[in-house]
Amino acid sequence: MQQVNKVVLAYSGGVDTSVCIPYLKNEYGISEVVTFVADLGQGEDLELIRKKALNSGASKSIIGNLVSSFVERYAFPAIRANALYLDKYPLSTALARPLIAENLVNIAREINADAVAHGCTGKGNDQVRFDLAINALGPDLKIITPAREWNMSREEAILYGEKFGIPAPVSKKSPYSIDVNLLGRSIEAGILEDPMQEAPEDIFAMTSSINNSPESPLDIEIIFKNGFPVGINNEFLNPVEIIQKANVLAGEYGFGRIDMMEDRVVGIKSREIYETPGLLLLIKAHKELESITLNPDVIDFKGVVEKKWGQLVYQGFWFGPLKESLDAFIASTQTSVNGRVKIRLHKGNAIVIGRISENNSLYREDLATYSQDDVFKHSLAEGFIYMWGMSNKIWAELNSKKID
């Protein structure tokens, strides 16, 4: 490999990325390691993380405020797509990776870096997401992946960092790997690697336990315009505020925990714990509003598109032609997704109890009612059923003769 003199490293302050700084300098002989810290609304003191990078040997450390872009360009499209990987996971971590990769490439261009680097391990999904996004946006840039090459366990990585005076953010006795952004938290490793071991309560931070959540339910209304959430309880909010408020409301009532077996891109199954209260709540409400504003065939086909959309994002193809085409289809369905959805939060549940679309509802009470106001023409049903089932009737007659 041609000698790299300057590299931009995606930096979080965690075990792997912290160890990457001395590793890149000492093992690769790179003179300048510039770190990029993405502000994704994780609520950490990013200035401390920036200083940690500098103290670990980085020549420069850059903080990028990506919160608004993260919500508007990534989270909101996921809501429109009702994105749930394996029908459970709303891609809270996966959505952040292409945005970080995009900024890595942009910074590399600005400072004339030879390469970009990340601290993803060789068995995770994030390595795929970073590499595919970087290759799509900066195919000429080298990608350096120390954690994929050094073959160190998490414990060994901690010890390596300690040799260079880098304190680990986790204890050796409780080595959870936690990723946090505005959309949620992902927790793995430690005792969670036993799929039968119940996740301890102390790993959760965004959601209350069912026992500690309020005894009385809370009813809320979520307002949508063109498929985007725009308000909660008659209060119109900007995109970031929508996510923040949804997180607080759903989290307080214990909604938004996911404990699942996940099929990783690299072919293995992994036990994952997620907290995504606001995003799950908004997807649930959005899907419900579509049930009253979209035609049945559109809903049916959009379900196929949604599944593929979620797979593409999970597998790292955010910047790809199929994803772009699916985006166009989804956007075309959302002009009529306007209205409000009422949800009851209680003891870990979010139960839809109402939905309305003043201008785009396909529900006709005068057709659906069983009261005297019914305008449905019942006499047409017999002819409809005769034609609807004709092919099946012919098949049945033919096969009954064969049996005789």
UniProtKB/Swiss-Prot annotation:
Q: Which top class of enzyme applies to this chain?
A: ligase
- Record gene name: argG
Coiled-coil stretches are none
Q: Where does L-citrulline bind?
A: 89, 125, 129, 177, 186, 262, 274
Q: How does it assemble?
A: Homotetramer.
**What reaction(s) does this enzyme catalyze?**
L-citrulline + L-aspartate + ATP = 2-(N(omega)-L-arginino)succinate + AMP + diphosphate + H(+)
PROSITE patterns per UniProt: ARGININOSUCCIN_SYN_1, ARGININOSUCCIN_SYN_2
Task: Write down what this protein is called.
Answer: Argininosuccinate synthase
- Look up the domain of life of the source: Bacteria
Q: What is the lineage of its organism?
A: Bacteria, Bacillati, Cyanobacteriota, Cyanophyceae, Synechococcales
